[in-house]
UniProtKB/Swiss-Prot annotation:
Family, as annotated: Belongs to the SfsA family.
Disulfide partners: none
Domain of life, source organism: Bacteria
Protein name as it appears in the record: Sugar fermentation stimulation protein homolog
């Protein structure tokens, strides 16, 4: 996935009201852009940090740009646009770059399932039956250990998805929790129990129920993103 048109560089002035960010471009222009991330963005939004944004010429848009990347205090690049994760995973699925999930006959997005009114990010159909996938974008890295963590804020919705996946697995349906690690320089992933212990508990229970827990690390550059390799998940 390449950024087209190319991203522009700037520095962060502030993020506010969840979906807004003020930045200063490399040319000194001050802009208010869209922040496409509902999380805390812990470690991705320190004042003055380098950011990269995409610009749109669509006259229907209220804001001229979208925040795409941040440089973390550890010098890593993080893709903060959470919508990119699903597109990146779909691109990898269709290219056969996730061997554990290869061989499907069809792919559907945003499929309703479960008893708690959930929507799976993807439903894949195989000769042996269906497979449901929930995708989570991971950008949180606490220190220099090269271990990323999820979530970066308490997520009741994320725990609900794990319960739904676990129920499928208990019924004999393949269910996958897939972490798309959009943070450079990462070697493993773990639940952020210090932020949301209930989510960590739900993840371990889902794994015990038969949910397949996968993590894939993206190659993150200012030119584009590519799902590069599988990473271990430390439960």
């Amino acid at each position: 996935m390449r950024f087209d048109p190319p991203l522009e560089e700037g520095r962060l002035l502030r993020r506010y009201k969840r979906f807004l960010a003020d930045i200063e471009s490399a040319g000194g222009e001050r802009l208010t852009i869209h922040c496409p991330n509902t999380g805390s963005m812990l470690n991705c939004m320190s004042e003055g940090c380098r950011v990269w944004f995409s610009r749109s010429d669509d006259p229907r848009r209220k804001l001229p740009g979208t925040w795409e990347l941040s440089e973390t205090p550890q010098g890593r690049l993080a893709c903060v646009n959470t919508a990119r994760a699903n597109r990146l995973v779909e691109e990898a699925l269709l290219a056969g770059d996730i061997p554990e999930l290869a061989g499907f006959a069809s792919l559907r997005r945003e499929v309703a399932y479960g008893v708690e009114n959930s929507r799976a990010d993807f439903r894949l159909e195989y000769p042996a039956g269906a497979l449901f996938i929930e995708v989570k974008s991971v950008t949180l890295g606490f220190d220099e250990t090269a271990v990323a963590a999820f979530p970066d804020a308490v997520t009741l919705r994320g725990a609900k998805h794990l319960r739904e996946l676990a129920a499928l697995a208990r019924d004999g349906v393949r269910a996958v929790q897939l972490y798309c690690v959009n943070l450079s320089g990462i070697e493993a992933v773990r639940p952020a129990d210090e932020i949301d212990p209930a989510y960590g508990k739900a993840l371990r229970e889902a794994a015990q129920a038969g949910v397949e827990v996968l993590a894939y690390g993206a190659e993150v550059t200012t030119e584009g993103l590519r799902l590069a390799r599988r990473l271990p998940v430390r439960l």
